[in-house]
Amino acid sequence: MKLFETRTAPNPRRVRMFLAEKGLLDQIELVQVDIEKGENLSPEFVARNPMKKVPVLELEDGTCVAETMAICRYFEESYPDTPSLLGESPLEKALVEQWLRWIEFYFMMPTGMCFQHTTGYFKDRMNPIKEWGEECGQGVDKFMHFLNKQLEGKEYLCCDRFTAVDINSYFRQADADAS
């Protein structure tokens, strides 16, 4: 299996941590994609993921799976004898999904919008609106306060153990701090 990724990008880092926690990282060939040079726009890459984003998992038969949590779900289901990071019981699975959605909608998306609209990094690919980016940044601050409240007296955000929720919140917080 091959994981097409960019070492510094947050979503591939989430997949790598997920794989490391499951003890599977050494079973994957990591293929670096230079998004700054536009390698993700090449016909070869677009054939793997028409959304032109990393990460992309390419299976032995050539099937490609894109999107961070879809890749994580593949490994969760394919390797049931490894630590469960997406929940074991129906309740745990529901709680993990709830938290993953909250982090996605109220933390990841606004952090990404803040970065894209305030740094100029994507100015050649989009029309950044600084005010929108700043407003998104304020929403990120509010959600970070919410996360801190939820963690008071606890080691983990969900299920009283380490899950994908902790991975996703960790990397997004690191990105939010950098933005």
Which ranges hold each PLM region?
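GST-like domain detector, emphasizing the conserved glutathione-binding G-site
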Residues: 1-134
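GST-like fold's C-terminal all-alpha helical module
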Residues: 103-179
